[in-house]
């Protein structure tokens, strides 16, 4: 039997406000435990929440970015449950009246086609604290620094059909929230966490299967592995005659599998009711338009501009526009060197290779955009050749200085004088008379391969300083 996966994601995005959603406590990541929790966060008697307008503005920004409807009246509710890191015994969230209603988001599939995914809603809520297990023997510590940090929970319709589609959707969300500046999107720090709802059904069947929810997956790679593993687990279970249980599961990255955490709750288990301490949020058209006027250029708009303004291919523009930091880096470097294609090739090639090897984002690159631009300027004006440029980039990466300084110190200035290069070529041809005869006797197809030998020997004699293009031109004349 052929099976089909049905996947929906609930993504919790930590908003980049300076203070918490209902208190004035700071939201800085990495502070000492319980140093950023005030009386409101600790649920001390008599403390009342005060709405952070900046969180509302950020939610509206996101809604406008995905073409969603902004609810003119949204209501906060109490979601009641007990957990040690939830001091009040309830979480303030939004149930029936979220700030953002239905929107759309386009993702690109592996085959190059686009697919539109419906975003059901995006609602504001407060984050819980954090349980600490490592430093306590036989006990659990509670850190309430995170309690009350504003979250935007973004819920998709179950329209995703594979683990890879889910990751494409998540990456697109990540791109949007970071472009907007409403979140840093750092999944390693919990700024973006994903709950994955997964079920399977026979292909062609309209009814949904029994779903499981995989909680708090915190990387793109783990989302793909967790969903794919859960799809396979459910199919194996059904084909062996078993039944899928509606439950919450956790992904174990070390064992690369999911394990049962608890039976899945329903909304009525939380006894939602409107929070009497918070008035409904009223959002009028003037406010919405004021927020709309602050929207930055979004990923798809930037991609289109990169194609039209810089003449980049859709693929190159898509890669460079995938993150705001990378797009800004590209434009800053291009402004210096004046060659968009050259800049794109080096960012996506030599620089990306080093970033990936060191698990760094481009914003953490030891080589600045200005530094790369100045290096490529020397490559473009033939001060150095391609091989030397790679050596200079490596030295810059290792903190040895700026491009011009390294070029001078290492003596990498290219030889571009025709007579000097011709002398190198003459020496190579004189030392390889047999190969010259073989070349002249060969057909055009073989000559194309053999010319590389002479180029290589010339570069060797010139200690890599000869301009390869000039070497090729002079060799072609002398061997014709």
From Swiss-Prot:
EC number: 6.3.5.-
Keyword Oxidoreductase among UniProt keywords: no
Keywords, comma-separated and alphabetical: ATP-binding, Ligase, Nucleotide-binding, Protein biosynthesis
Catalytic activities: L-glutamyl-tRNA(Gln) + L-glutamine + ATP + H2O = L-glutaminyl-tRNA(Gln) + L-glutamate + ADP + phosphate + H(+); L-aspartyl-tRNA(Asn) + L-glutamine + ATP + H2O = L-asparaginyl-tRNA(Asn) + L-glutamate + ADP + phosphate + 2 H(+)
Pfam families: GatB_N (PF02934), GatB_Yqey (PF02637)
ATP-binding among keywords: yes
Alphabetical list of InterPro entries matching this protein: Asn/Gln-tRNA_amidoTrfase_suB/E (IPR017959), Asn/Gln-tRNA_Trfase_suB/E_cat (IPR006075), Asn/Gln_amidotransferase (IPR018027), Asn/Gln_tRNA_amidoTrase-B-like (IPR003789), GatB (IPR004413), GatB_C_1 (IPR042114), GatB_Yqey_C_2 (IPR023168), Gln-tRNA_amidoTrfase_suB_CS (IPR017958)
Quaternary structure note: Heterotrimer of A, B and C subunits.
Function: Allows the formation of correctly charged Asn-tRNA(Asn) or Gln-tRNA(Gln) through the transamidation of misacylated Asp-tRNA(Asn) or Glu-tRNA(Gln) in organisms which lack either or both of asparaginyl-tRNA or glutaminyl-tRNA synthetases. The reaction takes place in the presence of glutamine and ATP through an activated phospho-Asp-tRNA(Asn) or phospho-Glu-tRNA(Gln).
NCBIfam families (UniProt xref): gatB (TIGR00133), PRK05477.1-2 (NF004012), PRK05477.1-4 (NF004014), PRK05477.1-5 (NF004015)
HAMAP family according to UniProt: GatB
Protein family per UniProt: Belongs to the GatB/GatE family. GatB subfamily.
UniProt protein name: Aspartyl/glutamyl-tRNA(Asn/Gln) amidotransferase subunit B
């Amino acid at each position: 039997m052929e099976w089909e996966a049905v996947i929906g994601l609930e993504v919790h995005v930590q908003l980049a406000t300076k203070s918490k959603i209902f208190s004035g406590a700071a939201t800085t990541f990495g502070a000492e435990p319980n140093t950023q929790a005030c009386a409101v966060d600790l649920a001390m008697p008599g403390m009342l929440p005060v709405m952070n307008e900046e969180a509302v503005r950020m939610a509206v920004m996101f809604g406008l970015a995905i073409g969603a409807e902004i609810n003119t009246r949204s209501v906060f509710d109490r979601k009641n449950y007990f957990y040690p890191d939830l001091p009040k015994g309830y979480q303030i969230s939004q149930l029936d009246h979220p700030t953002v209603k239905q929107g759309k988001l386009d993702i690109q599939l592996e085959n190059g086609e686009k697919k539109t995914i419906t975003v059901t809603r995006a609602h504001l809520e407060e984050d819980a604290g954090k349980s600490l297990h490592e430093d306590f023997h036989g006990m659990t510590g509670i850190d309430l620094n995170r309690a009350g940090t504003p979250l935007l929970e973004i819920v998709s319709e179950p329209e995703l059909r594979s683990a890879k589609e889910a990751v494409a959707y998540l990456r697109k969300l990540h791109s949007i929230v970071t472009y907007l500046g409403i979140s840093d999107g750092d999944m390693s720090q919990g700024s973006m966490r994903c709950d994955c709802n997964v079920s399977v059904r026979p292909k062609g069947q309209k009814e949904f299967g029994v779903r499981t929810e995989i909680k708090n997956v915190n990387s793109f790679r783990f989302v793909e592995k967790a969903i794919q593993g859960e799809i396979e687990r459910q199919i194996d279970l059904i084909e062996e005659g078993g039944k899928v249980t509606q439950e919450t599961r956790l992904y174990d990255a070390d064992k690369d599998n999911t394990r049962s955490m608890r039976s899945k709750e329903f909304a009525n288990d939380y006894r939602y009711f409107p929070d009497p301490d918070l008035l409904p949020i009223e959002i009028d058209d003037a406010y919405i338009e004021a927020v709309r006027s602050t929207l930055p250029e979004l990923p798809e708009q930037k991609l289109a501009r990169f194609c039209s303004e810089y003449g980049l291919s859709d693929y190159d523009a898509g890669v460079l526009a995938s993150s705001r930091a990378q797009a800004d880096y590209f434009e800053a470097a291009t402004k210096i060197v004046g060659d968009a294609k050259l800049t794109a090739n080096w960012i996506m090639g030599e620089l990306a290779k080093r970033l990936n090897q060191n698990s760094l984002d481009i914003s953490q690159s030891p080589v600045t955009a200005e530094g790369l631009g100045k290096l490529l300027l020397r490559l473009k004006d033939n001060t150095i050749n391609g091989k030397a440029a790679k050596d200079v980039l490596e030295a810059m990466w290792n903190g040895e200085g700026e491009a011009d300084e390294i070029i001078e110190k290492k003596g990498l200035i290219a030889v571009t004088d025709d007579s000097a290069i011709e002398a190198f070529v003459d020496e190579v041809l004189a030392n390889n008379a047999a190969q010259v005869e073989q070349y002249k006797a060969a057909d055009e197809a073989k000559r194309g391969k053999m010319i590389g030998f002479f180029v290589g020997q010339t570069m060797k004699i010139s200690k890599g300083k000869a301009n390869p293009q000039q070497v090729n031109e002079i060799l072609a004349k002398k061997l014709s």
